[in-house]
Every structure is written in C-alpha cells, then in structure tokens.
Amino acid sequence: MAKKKAFSPIFHLSFIVFLPWGIYLSFKKCLGSWITNWWNTSESEIFLNIIQEKSILENFIELEEFLFVEEIFKNNSETHPQEFHTGIHKEAIQFIKIQNESYIHMILRLSTNLICVVIISGFYIWRNETLVILNSWSREFLYNLSDTVKVFSILLLTDLCIGFHSPHGWELMIGSIYKDFGFVQNDRIISGLVSTFPVILDTIFKYWIFRYLNRVSPSLVVIYHSMND
C-alpha cells in the first residue's frame, strides 16, 4: 500500500512533464504539411507580407547593396547591368525561399504551442484529481523538511530568480520563449521584461514572507533573516 502511495505522485508528475512534450511533437508533425500548403495560398501570402513588409524591404535593400559592392570588387571595373540584375534576381529568389521557410516555422511553432496550451489546460481542468494528488504530495514533502532546509531552498530559489546574476538567465529564458512561440526577437521588449519582471517577483516574494510565513511559521522567518544577513 505504501509503495503504491509513493508511486502515484511519481506517475502523475511524469505524466505532467511528458504529456506537453508528446502533444507538442505530435501536433508539430501533423500540422507541418497543412501549414505549408496553407501558406502557399495567395490569401496567406498577402496577409503576412503586409505584416512583414518593412522587414522584407530592409533586408532586400541590404542584399542589393551587398551584391553591388561584391560585384565591384570582383570586376574591379564598371559593372555590367544585365549580369548584376541577374545576380540580384537569383539571390532574391533564394532570399524569398528563406523568408518563406522562416514564416512557415513561425506559424507552425505558434499554432502548435497554442493548441498544446488549450489541450493541456482542458485536460488538467477535467482531470483535477491529478493536481490534487500532486498538491497533497508536495505539501507532505515540504512539511517533512526541516526549517533549515526550507530556508536554504528559499534562498537558493530567490537567488536564481531575482539575484544579482539572474538578468542573464531571464534574458535567455524569455528569448527562448520568443523563439519557441515563433515571434521575432525584439531586444527592447526583452530588455524591458528582464528589468521589470524580477522586480515584480521580488515584491511578491517579500509580501508572501510577510503575510504567509509570519502566520504559518515565525521560526522560519527568523532563520531566513539570519541566513540572509
């Protein structure tokens, strides 16, 4: 009976970890060909080209300038307009293919992640028993820890999330989320999130210590302040 009781939380925890991964891979494989075919219709091209028009024009102008300079260095003389335009045409086709693949992957990642979030959220709402079992197991596990271990875990977690070196970690994590959802990386937005999100977390954590830990375990608060100082 005890073995079965110990196995149940591990099973549910493994289920929560591997279910999103399995759903993501399955939908990514299934939706790939469908999104590629949808992209090749004129409606999708018009819609996305309007959104990305500025980016495409800037990249194409840079490509044209690069090819012009490269042609000058190759010939060391006056360039031939016909050859130059032919080269631009070939490179432009290659550039459009790369952009096309980039947009397909962007839509695929975004749609797959959104579908996964909806399915997993619905599943956990429907199977509330799984979350109840994990909640009771985690409460029992934390209750059996000593106050010193609890404080050490809190300090380690807070230093990782809102410590001196945490901005670099937040930058990598937010950048990976941007990439995973298929968004174009924006350094200004990422910098703003990195500079504000840890501050918000720090405020929430201090409020939690003040309201919850003082009420539940005053000795834990004393040990926390002693170790933190």
UniProtKB/Swiss-Prot annotation:
Topology versus the membrane: Multi-pass membrane protein
Bilayer-crossing regions: 7-27, 106-126, 189-209
Location(s) in or outside the cell: Plastid membrane
Catalyses which reaction(s): K(+)(in) + H(+)(out) = K(+)(out) + H(+)(in)
GO biological process: proton transmembrane transport
GO cellular component: plastid membrane
InterPro entries for the chain: CemA
Keyword entries, A-Z: Hydrogen ion transport, Ion transport, Membrane, Plastid, Transmembrane, Transmembrane helix, Transport
Family recorded in the similarity comment: Belongs to the CemA family.
Free-text function comment from the UniProt entry: May be involved in proton extrusion.
Name of the molecule in the record: Potassium/proton antiporter CemA
